[in-house]
Amino acid sequence: MSSSAAALAWRRSLRDALLRGSAWRGAPAANSAAARLASTASASEAAAGPKKVPPPPRKGRLLTGAMIGLAIAGGAYVSTADEAKFCGWLFKSTQLVNPLFALLDAEFAHRLAVTAASHGFVPREKRPDPSVLGLEIWGRKFTNPIGLAAGFDKNAEAVEGLLGMGFGFVEVGSVTPLPQEGNPKPRIFRLREHGAVINRCGFNSEGIVVVAKRLGAQHGKRKMEETSSSTSPTTSDVKQGGKAGPGILGVNLGKNKISEDATADYVQGVHTLSQYADYLVINVSSPNTPGLRKLQGRKQLKDLVKKVQAARDEMQWAEDGPPPLLVKIAPDLSKQDLEDIAAVALALRLDGLIISNTTISRPSPADTHPLAQEAGGLSGKPLFDLSTNVLREMYILTRGKIPLIGCGGVSSGEDAYKKIRSGATLVQLYTAFAYGGPALIPRIKAELAECLERDGFKSVQEAVGADFK
């Protein structure tokens, strides 16, 4: 791309983002009853006239202004710089915004970050990933193994922006069948000095209908991008990216708090959302939904997985078949629990496991923090050792036959490398991204590539489970 063409594209994207971002987004639907009475609610709102949306707090306006300023500066810079240098500059420049995010309420900062990504106020990675990071799994080629875990983009609002930042894959959700608000606020607590977060959000979700419409609209756009990119010559017969276009998209499914039939909730999620997913996740490990973790028991998990697999397989699929089905488990499990889960996974030929969700324990040094007693699941650096130990144990129990995604406490390329050597084929992060911002993504990928090359590995797949070989 020439510098003039790049500048024109940048200005157009900035203009479009400004137009789309002129109105601040309202809150999600309040409860499950609102979903069942959607038509009545819509009529009532029409009669009452448009809602008045309160302006964002002053800190939010300042932060938005700073982000727009960076975008304008980037537009000026790209006019005179080559694309690679511009990308590097833009990613590094986002670090200037991180201190401003720290001044905001945790949940408002998260909301603002999602809005920024959905409207294009984030850098877009144009540099190719190091070839050593590429791998193939489930018939899809990942350009790198670093993914964004579920919880950041709960309602699939910013998939394209997040994939564009350079993640190898993005997982949206957890998505529940009916809209629900989740637990009362405040429900997100920063333990900044420990690189950790405690949350008790409780599956706040706009529901599968809203998410399906959003993914459906994105699906068409991604399909066109895939068709366009397929005209370019390639040396590989495996598509780079997912069946719905460039980039791999996972959909994480949850259950409603008021639901008495968890299986029905997951089946409904599969029927509605699987057509847009490159892989599906059954989340049975959040500590913030009462009774959810009981589904990790051997009998309960076996019954659940069999019914969800059947629901997926009964749908009509093209040549590439149905999306892989994974289960996300907790780190707070006994040896017997892990053995039971491994047995179910092997017996039912589960496509993968995500290890792990947040912990209800308070690993050192987070246990000394004043907020440590807040209820909820802890994520971030203090979770790394616990989640990695569970990962290692599960790799042994499954004999390396089931792809594992390592999640929990990853904040550097070295951390990702340790997860891979411990048995992870892919790696996810979230909390470190919340603290470090977009600049973290290229740094982790570069560090991981250095680790692999340092130890003589020619690919990620060669290093998977290396500690046991």
Swiss-Prot record:
Q: Where does FMN bind?
A: 150-154, 174, 252, 283, 328, 356, 380, 409, 430-431
Compositionally skewed regions (Low complexity) per UniProt: 227-236
Answer yes or no on keyword Cell inner membrane.
no
Please give the catalytic activity noted in the UniProt record: (S)-dihydroorotate + a quinone = orotate + a quinol
Instruction: Name its pathway.
Output: Pyrimidine metabolism; UMP biosynthesis via de novo pathway; orotate from (S)-dihydroorotate (quinone route): step 1/1
**Localization annotation:** Mitochondrion inner membrane
Q: What cofactor requirement does the entry state?
A: FMN
The record gives the membrane topology as:
Single-pass membrane protein
Classification via Pfam families: DHO_dh (PF01180)
Which GO MF term does the entry hold, naming one? Answer: dihydroorotate dehydrogenase activity
Region annotation (Disordered) maps to: 219-247
**May I have one GO cellular component term?**
mitochondrial inner membrane
Keyword Protease present in the record's keywords: the answer is no
Q: Where does substrate bind?
A: 154, 199-203, 283-288, 357-358
Bilayer-crossing regions: 62-82
Q: Name one GO biological process term.
A: pyrimidine ribonucleotide biosynthetic process
- Annotated active site residues, numbered on this chain, are 286 (nucleophile)
What Enzyme Commission number(s) does the record list for this chain? 1.3.5.2
User: What is the free-text note on the cofactor?
Assistant: Binds 1 FMN per subunit.
- Transit peptide located at which residues? 1-37
Q: NCBIfam families in the record, alphabetically? A: PRK05286.1-2 (NF003645), PRK05286.2-5 (NF003652), pyrD_sub2 (TIGR01036)
What's its job?
Catalyzes the conversion of dihydroorotate to orotate with quinone as electron acceptor.
Name the protein family: Belongs to the dihydroorotate dehydrogenase family. Type 2 subfamily.
User: What is the official name of this protein in its record?
Assistant: Dihydroorotate dehydrogenase (quinone), mitochondrial
Say which species the protein is native to: Oryza sativa subsp. japonica (Rice)
Encoding gene (name): PYRD
